[in-house]
């Protein structure tokens, strides 16, 4: 029996090589990428480059506006380096603009203008009164950006509100130096003999939608002195339940005693607003215990006598008479003792005659004259010598 041979199967042909080769070449070949050159010029702006001169793909460069220009809202200030080596498209984003509107002491911008930073020519902004101010209807609260990029002036269309008129301060005074409008300050003080309890000043400030004084007004309370001290051997007049400023009490002593010190003292106020008496109370001392002062006599060494002495008169003998010599008396005088100086008046006999030359028969006539004053200095020396010799 002859067996039949199985037919041989041919292997399947390999896949086409060209498409695979093409794909391999695409995967293995490097990608061609281009660098961007300097960023483009954009009107009214300048790029922020740093140290870079070439920029790789996807690099970004930002711009800032030149002086006098502002970035237009919602416009980008950035360009991007694309894969083709070109910069992304751009448009002018810097335009002329006024600076931010002026801040006013009496008004502020309305809310819709607070976040704006671009104000081209012709832009109008509106203000509203600040707290503490109220609007004056005839005046507008607007400003316009002018051609020369400055804002038109804004009239003072708001005026200050007024605080309530302060009432009188009992036993005190309210000083109002600048009025009672918003922002003003008033000061408080008390009359002598009263103490200020509370604030010494307050301001007119905003309270809700109106204005009012910051603090509650103070009060002036009367200052009292402590009870005056009593004294021994004496009494006090003017006692009361309380003692206020300038009130007086008077002391007197019992019989047989003498008052030493101020008879009256009064209630006064210290720098710290504390009541105190003007001085300590007096004392009463027994008369027998009061020291007596012995009189003192001052004897000056020089000077003229205080009481003139009566002149001494003696007769001068007629010519030819011999005076009887007198024994000098000795006087002891200390150098510091005051010795009165006497005046000596000598009577000189003068014989008078008639016009016919007749002699005087009626005795001698005497006249006062030739008064001799011995100076104190000479007398002092003489007396000292006499005392020394004896």
Swiss-Prot record:
GO biological process, any = regulation of complement-dependent cytotoxicity
Query: Where does it localize?
Result: Cell membrane
- UniProt keyword Membrane present: yes
- Pfam families, alphabetically? Sushi (PF00084)
As for family, the record states: Belongs to the receptors of complement activation (RCA) family.
Free-text function comment from the UniProt entry:
This protein recognizes C4b and C3b fragments that condense with cell-surface hydroxyl or amino groups when nascent C4b and C3b are locally generated during C4 and c3 activation. Interaction of daf with cell-associated C4b and C3b polypeptides interferes with their ability to catalyze the conversion of C2 and factor B to enzymatically active C2a and Bb and thereby prevents the formation of C4b2a and C3bBb, the amplification convertases of the complement cascade.
Know the name of this protein? Complement decay-accelerating factor, GPI-anchored
Source organism of this protein record:
Mus musculus
Gene name, Swiss-Prot/TrEMBL: Cd55
């Amino acid at each position: 029996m002859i067996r039949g041979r199985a037919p041989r199967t041919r292997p399947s042909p390999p896949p086409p090589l060209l498409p695979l080769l093409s794909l391999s070449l695409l995967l293995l070949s490097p990608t061609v990428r281009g660098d961007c050159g300097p960023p483009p010029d954009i009107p009214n702006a300048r790029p922020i480059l740093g140290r870079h001169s070439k920029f790789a793909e996807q690099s970004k460069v930002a711009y800032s506006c030149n002086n006098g220009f502002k970035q237009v809202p919602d416009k980008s200030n950035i360009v991007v380096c694309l894969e083709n080596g070109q910069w992304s498209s751009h448009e002018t984003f810097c335009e002329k603009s006024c600076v931010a509107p002026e801040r006013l002491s009496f008004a502020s911008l309305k809310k819709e203008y607070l976040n704006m930073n671009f104000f081209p020519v012709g832009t109008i902004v509106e203000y509203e009164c600040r707290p503490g101010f109220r609007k004056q209807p005839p005046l507008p609260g607007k400003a316009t950006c002018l051609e020369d990029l400055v804002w038109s002036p804004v009239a003072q269309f708001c005026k200050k509100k007024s605080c309530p008129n302060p009432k009188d301060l009992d036993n005190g005074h309210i000083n109002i130096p600048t009025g009672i409008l918003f922002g003003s300050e008033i000061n408080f003080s008390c009359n002598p003999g009263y103490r200020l309890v509370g604030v010494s000043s307050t301001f007119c400030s905003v309270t809700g939608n109106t204005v009012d004084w910051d603090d509650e007004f103070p009060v002036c309370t009367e200052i009292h002195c402590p009870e005056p001290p009593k004294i021994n051997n004496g009494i006090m007049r003017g006692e009361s339940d309380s003692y206020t400023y300038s009130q007086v009490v008077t002391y007197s002593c019992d019989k047989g005693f003498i008052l030493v010190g101020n008879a009256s003292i009064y209630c006064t106020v210290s720098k710290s607003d504390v009541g105190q008496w003007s001085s300590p109370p007096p004392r009463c001392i027994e008369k027998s215990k009061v020291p007596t002062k012995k009189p003192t006599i001052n004897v000056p060494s020089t000077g003229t006598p205080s009481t003139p002495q009566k002149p001494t008169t003696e007769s001068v003998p007629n010519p030819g008479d011999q005076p009887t010599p007198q024994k000098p008396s000795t006087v002891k005088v200390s150098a510091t003792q005051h010795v009165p100086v006497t005046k000596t008046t000598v009577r000189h006999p003068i014989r008078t005659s008639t016009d016919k030359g007749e002699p005087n028969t009626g005795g001698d006539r005497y006249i006062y004259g030739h008064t001799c004053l011995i100076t104190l200095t000479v007398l002092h020396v003489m007396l000292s010598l006499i005392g020394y010799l004896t």
